[in-house]
Amino acid sequence: MTSQFSTAGLTLELLRYPSQQVSNLQAWDAADEHIIKVLAEKVLEENAVPPQPCAIINDSFGALSCALTRMDSSWPLTVISDAKTSQLGALENLTRNQLDAEGIKWLTSRAPLPQDLSLVLMKLPKNLAYFAQQLRGLSQVLPQGTQVLIGAKAKSINSALITLLAEHLGPASASLAWKNTRVITCVSDGRARSLPKAITWSVPEYQLEISNLSNVFAANKLDIGARIMLENMPNGEFNTVVDLGCGNGILGLRAAGLYPKAKIHFIDDSEMAVASSQANWALNTLAPERAEFHWDDCMSHLDETVQPDLVLCNPPFHQGEAITDHIAWQMFNDAKHRLRSGGILHIVGNRHLNYHVKLKRLFGNCTTVASNGKFVILQSVKG
């Protein structure tokens, strides 16, 4: 797959993150190209000098950040992302293209937004509840008349989406299709909306209360994979447990009850997931000193002194819009590297993904703990 991004007279070298992954997936899509095309036409038409403060939201691996920096290195940019890998990927791609990132502000999805924005560029996320929250956040800071350009696949844009935009930010219209994408132009109506509250629900069979922020998987119920995992947790005593890809933290919360001597580390690529886990730890009145929370690309930046004797993992097989197993493979490799001798990796996965093949190759052993028609619980021990 090509790594050369070329549109509107710009040429960039862009790779996904981590760059060493063997993949046929690009670091951008046609919607990125379409946004830049529309923006370039807008800049030429308005001849705006100097460029005005701009926010870039949901920029997968920095295509938009790199393009705007290449167009004008003095462009005041704020890049907002929930995914650690998106932020790390954007930084790598800026460096790869010898672009200066010093002037870029990097914000998480929950951080207060700048008050001086004149333009917003967005990619449409899969999660529309998260998208609605992002729009409502923008409604609190954007003056009336501010344009928000949103790129997406043409098939994802319909009347319901236009209605959602009008409800949460302002009137919107879609461009003509180009490379099977459209760019929506939404104009802020200047009316501030309140942010939605986290969704809270109970898991009575484990005496747990769960609170989910908008971009966390399984927003208002226990997902099937987590349920079978909770029913088949490892027996024994553990001192250090990692909930890898923690989501709302349900596995780590259950581990805290089962293994009272253990310290639990919650790790996720999503900042909202980590925040939800931390909120749920407090919600269930667990001792603060027994937990640590990490916004990270798997265990890439976890302190080397942390040597777990148990890693719990419900790996995703999506990265944004892309279906890929490289995240699971990275999780398994990180677990193998970080587990102490005799430590256990305990995972749940869809049967058709054949994770047992990868685990047997990596650890030299793999045991099927439980299974049903859709999911399988697998366990490997580090020698």
Swiss-Prot record:
Record field: catalytic activity: guanosine(1835) in 23S rRNA + S-adenosyl-L-methionine = N(2)-methylguanosine(1835) in 23S rRNA + S-adenosyl-L-homocysteine + H(+)
Subcellular location: Cytoplasm
Keyword Methyltransferase: yes
Keyword S-adenosyl-L-methionine attributed: yes
GO CC term (a single one): cytoplasm
Keywords assigned: Cytoplasm, Methyltransferase, rRNA processing, S-adenosyl-L-methionine, Transferase
InterPro entries, per the entry: DNA_methylase_N6_adenine_CS (IPR002052), rRNA_m2G-MeTrfase_RlmG (IPR017237), RsmC/RlmG (IPR046977), SAM-dependent_MTases_sf (IPR029063), Small_mtfrase_dom (IPR007848)
UniProt GO MF annotations: 23S rRNA (guanine(1835)-N(2))-methyltransferase activity; nucleic acid binding
Family listed: Belongs to the methyltransferase superfamily. RlmG family.
Function of the protein: Specifically methylates the guanine in position 1835 (m2G1835) of 23S rRNA.
Identification of the protein by name: Ribosomal RNA large subunit methyltransferase G
Name of the encoding gene: rlmG
